[in-house]
């Protein structure tokens, strides 16, 4: 067998979820390209400003920005971004973005807006962790991602995507009861 090389795997530099004003909802950086928090915030502000006037509501858009490929999509009042080096395959990065936005949609049960995202921030951060580890892309299928994240929050008797609302409410009641009994 040949040696595994991190350079041979598609990778991303960061995954950003910003609100409609460009403020952070959930972000994760996998690269030292932005060494300080100030440089990260400056990058987020500039990429948000550059993409603000585009119409990325129905489909993801791809742009080259400061030597990086940035794939982005807007859903309600949330702006999803995935950044990669300019040597990465745009279609793979677009698949990462699609997997991220779709899995967030599944986990938030279609209520993809800032308030709901902040209330379920733990699920969104777990979602990012299931998609990318150390910059290496692990998974892009939204159902698989949401299923893995949901197994941490759901009893696992049924796949997350197949649960009915009554099952979800029952599960939520169980978790609430358990937390109150602790």
Curated annotation (Swiss-Prot):
Pfam families reported for this sequence: Clat_adaptor_s (PF01217)
Keyword annotations of the record: Cytoplasm, Cytoplasmic vesicle, ER-Golgi transport, Golgi apparatus, Membrane, Protein transport, Transport
GO cellular component: COPI vesicle coat; Golgi membrane
Topology in membrane: Peripheral membrane protein
Compartment list: Cytoplasm; Golgi apparatus membrane; Cytoplasmic vesicle, COPI-coated vesicle membrane
InterPro entries noted in UniProt: AP_mu_sigma_su, Coatomer_zeta, Longin-like_dom_sf
Keyword Cytoplasm: yes
One GO BP annotation of this record: intracellular protein transport
The keyword Signal appears for this protein: no
Main location class: cytoplasm
PANTHER family per UniProt: COATOMER SUBUNIT ZETA, ZETA-COAT PROTEIN
Description of how the protein assembles with itself and partners: Oligomeric complex that consists of at least the alpha, beta, beta', gamma, delta, epsilon and zeta subunits.
Protein family: Belongs to the adaptor complexes small subunit family.
The protein's name: Coatomer subunit zeta-2
Species of origin: Oryza sativa subsp. japonica
């Amino acid at each position: 067998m040949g040696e595994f090389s991190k350079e041979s795997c598609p990778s991303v530099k960061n995954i950003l979820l910003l609100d409609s004003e460009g403020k952070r909802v959930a972000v994760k950086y996998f690269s030292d390209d932005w060494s300080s928090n100030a440089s990260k915030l400056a990058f987020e502000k500039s990429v948000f400003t550059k993409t603000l006037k585009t119409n990325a509501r129905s489909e993801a858009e791809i742009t080259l920005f400061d030597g990086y490929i940035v794939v982005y999509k807007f859903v309600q009042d949330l702006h999803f971004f995935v950044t990669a080096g300019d040597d990465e395959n745009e279609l793979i990065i677009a698949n990462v973005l699609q997997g991220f936005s779709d899995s967030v949609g599944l986990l938030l049960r279609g209520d993809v807006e800032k308030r709901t995202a902040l209330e379920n921030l733990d699920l969104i951060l777990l979602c990012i962790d299931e998609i990318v580890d150390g910059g290496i892309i692990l998974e892009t299928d939204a159902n698989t991602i949401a299923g893995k994240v949901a197994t941490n929050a759901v009893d696992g008797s049924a796949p997350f995507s197949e649960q009915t609302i009554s099952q979800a409410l029952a599960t939520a009641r169980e978790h609430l009861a358990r937390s109150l009994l602790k």
